[in-house]
Amino acid sequence: MPLRLDIKRKFAQRSERVKSVDLHPTEPWILASLYSGTVCIWNYQTQTITKSFEVTELPVRSAKFIPRKQWVVAGADDMYIRVYNYNTMDKVKVFEAHSDYIRCVAVHPTLPYVLSSSDDMLIKLWDWENGWACTQIFEGHSHYVMQVVFNPKDTNTFASASLDRTIKIWNLGSPDPNFTLDAHQKGVNCVDYFTGGDKPYLITGSDDHTAKVWDYQTKSCVQTLDGHTHNVSAVCFHPELPIIITGSEDGTVRIWHATTYRLENTLNYGLERVWAIGYIKSSRRVVIGYDEGTIMVKLGREIPVASMDSSGKIIWAKHNEIQTANIKSIGAGYEATDGERLPLSVKELGTCDLYPQSLKHNPNGRFVVVCGDGEYIIYTALAWRNRSFGSGLEFVWSSEGECAVRESSSKIKIFSKNFQERKSIRPTFSAEKIFGGTLLAMCSNDFICFYDWAECRLIQQIDVTVKNLYWAESGDLVAIASDTSFYILKYNRELVSSHFDSGRPTDEEGVEDAFEVLHENDERVRTGIWVGDCFIYNNSSWKLNYCVGGEVTTMYHLDRPMYLLGYIANQSRVYLVDKEFNVIGYTLLLSLIEYKTLVMRGDLDRANQILPTIPKEQHNNVAHFLESRGMIEDALEIATDPDYKFDLAIQLGRLEIAKEIAEEVQSESKWKQLGELAMSSGKLQLAEDCMKYAMDLSGLLLLYSSLGDAEGVSKLACLAKEQGKNNVAFLCLFTLGRLEDCLQLLVESNRIPEAALMARSYLPSKVSEIVALWREDLSKVNPKAAESLADPEEYSNLFEDWQVALSVEANTAETRGVYTAAENYPSHADKPSITLVEAFRNLQVEAEESLENGNIDHEVAEENGHVENEGDEEEQQEEEVNEEEGVVDADSTDGAVLVNGSEVLTPHP
């Protein structure tokens, strides 16, 4: 049966001819050396070029990363080896290495060594800790040495491939080869070692169009791989999968089974001849170099083949080797830390006759099924004995221990608990996947159909593209995961049972309302498990989340890809495994899950009984959950974090609680936030206290001016000046009518030009003094400009109404300290504004006109004997009052100006 590997192209980039490729172990980088003389580093995640080195004008036939030094080493046809720092782009070393083209460079995995092979038929060893000195030369080949590669199982030895048709095995301590393999009928282009621990194999590729697998201990050919129609230019044993990859000048890459040597797949991306294949350990990515560019593919899934039963026993597969570990073997004395790798004792359980692609315990943990290569085998979990086997693409367990096998897209078999075939189904559609659990599910590309296990009756068809399916242990809830989101559905078991008991016919879409969609979440689920009514999963961003009642909580941010194994209730821990089979645990309290579940069901009494069992450090988590359910009052009672509790109190308008928290925390931002809420709520005394604590001087100015609190404004002016808040201090002083202090503040703030303009507007008598200061200050930077400043005392003709302004200042000086009560504002609000200079001038004009008219009328009155002395006296008294208060005649189009709550005359600038 075929290996059935998923092959996905992850990177494609056209370029000049690619002669070698390499993958970085930690960065998402592909290193490609080109025939044009350039070495490029591509980022396969962003699909962009990250670095580029112009090495030479001749071909660079080999380049490799040296990650532990942040270097790239490259060998070219100009016979030089060059070393670059790929971070700084600096050239670290350049030296002439050979007397002919350099075909290959190989980096020792641990020691500071680099091997190079050349058309001069020599292999040389270079030590970078010894100034890149050549410490050894290996002679023996009689033609070009095309490739050298270190043995990963014994890094003191290496193999070389030559066009003299041989493979030679060398030891770093000896200039002579250990032995020679007469490998092919024509020149050998490439060689690679098998990285697994069980086979002493290497593979070679030749111009005779074949690749051969060799046992280097017996020095015999194990298998010849025929199929290419041109020279085989690149070969490799994949480090993670049981496959051999060969590339040829016929333009194809062929994938062979490493055990059966069966051809599994052939790739042809239409980029002409294949020259290089690159891979790294612990990755399923393979990069291929062609005449016209670079391709990277991902083979299979990176999810580790592992399963854990409810007791904490884990079984996993490393290639064909089966290993086991038990979490409970650590002991109760071990204090587990979240995110820390568990020190498990790993034991060899046995081997598997097929290459495992999936492994799963049955519900009671007694059996384990392994699937792969189109077959399945059921083993006993303890002794690893073969219990049953058969052909099948997929195998699933029911929640009761029955099982189903998908033999093809048109045939599914159901087996009893004793693994006896009970039923065979031929669905009316192409079944691409099956899932087990409470119901048997079959998927096409567009929908999923649920069937009961007993009689395979259709329960319901749901139109959704399904990637995975997770049943809760109760059988009442199911999570359906697609490529971009997941859905939580409720299975109405009683409704379905009553439907079938009634004998009513079932239509093609199944039982209506068999499933009810409870929640939908736009997150991609990588792996998931249920704990009660809580769905735990990790998403595409590698966050470990759990979902209760549609509310998603992030437990932890994972620092690398990890996959869920299961949950052990008596430890309140969820366990995950990474690609290296490291097991990691995280705390998830069962009491917390139960509490949230009861709240979702509306059973608050039982939830409150569980609350005391939840540790205090988790109460904020509970409070956030309650807030999301709209239970803000309850959240406020439970919350322990002062910041969060303060936000809840503000949200509820509980100002006293918020004040207590603010007093405890003494946070300026909290006082300010509380002050704004108190102001909007009419709690003016609290607002004042908050603004004082928060040093919100602008808010205090607004409050005091609104209240007409002159004393408060006066104190605020002093405080603002101390705090350096000159704008607030100026407004306070101006509001109080303390114009001299305003001028002084401007001068002290070195705002002398503004002080001069203010003096001209409000205190003309101070202009000369300020102008003198201005001249003195300006003369330091521009003497000519300083001389051009005009003093009104010297040039009064340049200042309109100067004498009038002085008179107005003298007449209004006494009124600046008088403040009209705020309650009288309505009687002053409608009066028009006018400059006091203009008002003063109007008064003078009216007085003159009144005087002239008054003399004529008096003479006429004397002649007629009708002198109305009484009326004249009243008018005179009214004029005197108006003159004292600075009020213009009500019949005039001009009016008084309100300054600081008092009617005063303001001079015109």
Swiss-Prot record:
SUPFAM superfamilies: WD40 repeat-like (SSF50978). CDD domains: Coatomer_WDAD_beta-like, WD40. One of its GO terms (cellular component) is COPI-coated vesicle membrane. GO terms for biological process: intracellular protein transport; vesicle-mediated transport. Residues 862-909 are annotated as: Disordered. It is found in: Cytoplasm; Golgi apparatus membrane; Cytoplasmic vesicle, COPI-coated vesicle membrane. It comes from the Eukaryota. Disulfide bonds: none annotated. The keyword Nucleotide-binding does not apply. Transmembrane segments: none annotated. The keyword Oxidoreductase does not apply. GO terms for molecular function: structural molecule activity. It holds the Pfam family B-prop_COPA_B_2nd. InterPro entries: Beta-prop_COPA/B_2nd, Coatomer_complex_subunit, COPB2, G-protein_beta_WD-40_rep, TPR_COPA_B, WD40/YVTN_repeat-like_dom_sf, WD40_repeat_dom_sf, WD40_rpt. Keywords: Cytoplasm, Cytoplasmic vesicle, ER-Golgi transport, Golgi apparatus, Membrane, Protein transport, Repeat, Transport, WD repeat. WD repeats lie at residues 13-52, 55-94, 97-136, 140-180, 183-224, 227-266, 269-309, 351-390, 461-501. It is a peripheral membrane protein. Residues 870-892 have a biased composition (Acidic residues). Belongs to the WD repeat COPB2 family. The coatomer is a cytosolic protein complex that binds to dilysine motifs and reversibly associates with Golgi non-clathrin-coated vesicles, which further mediate biosynthetic protein transport from the ER, via the Golgi up to the trans Golgi network. Coatomer complex is required for budding from Golgi membranes, and is essential for the retrograde Golgi-to-ER transport of dilysine-tagged proteins. Oligomeric complex that consists of at least the alpha, beta, beta', gamma, delta, epsilon and zeta subunits. This is Coatomer subunit beta'-3.
